């Protein structure tokens, strides 16, 4: 997750805004908002070694989102999370896509996570296979027809 071990969760999330020249008060407020969205407000003053793997992952997600990038590359964004938190993270990513126009590219082996996306690109043995629209979120985990090509 590349969290800085001697900085608290909130300080880790604030860091990109520090380099953008955002005031201390504003970056702290924004970082707390993102930690709250990810269910970590109570853990803001804890250091990475005091957090679970899932909590560390959510801090890293908050840090990635705080600058409101145009594109997010999310490699297994729910990998270390429990099912409830996984749903919350995917809802947040969908919300950012719909409301703020962010492009979200999710890499996952989990069909349930893939099914939350609008388009699924199947890759097998490093080769792009089928690309399917998934606006109704009812895709088969193996592509249309149930087979990967």
Protein language model annotation of sequence segments:
Residues 1-123:
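ABC family nucleotide-binding domain
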Residues 127-149:
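Conserved beta-strand-loop-alpha-helix hinge in the C-terminal portion
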């Amino acid at each position: 997750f590349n969290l800085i071990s001697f900085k608290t969760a909130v300080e880790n999330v604030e860091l990109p805004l520090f380099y953008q020249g955002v005031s201390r008060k504003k970056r702290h407020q924004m970082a707390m908002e993102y930690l709250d969205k990810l269910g970590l407000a109570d853990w803001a003053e804890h250091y990475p070694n005091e957090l679970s793997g899932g909590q560390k992952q959510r801090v890293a997600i908050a840090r990635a989102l705080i600058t409101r990038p145009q594109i997010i590359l999310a490699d297994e964004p729910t990998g270390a999370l429990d099912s409830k938190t996984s749903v919350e993270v995917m809802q947040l990513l969908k919300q950012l896509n719909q409301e703020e126009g962010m492009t979200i590219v999710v890499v996952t082996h989990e069909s349930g996570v893939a099914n939350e996306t609008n388009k699924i690109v199947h890759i097998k043995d490093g080769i792009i296979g089928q690309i399917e629209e998934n606006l109704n979120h009812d895709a088969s985990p193996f592509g249309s027809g149930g087979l990967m090509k």
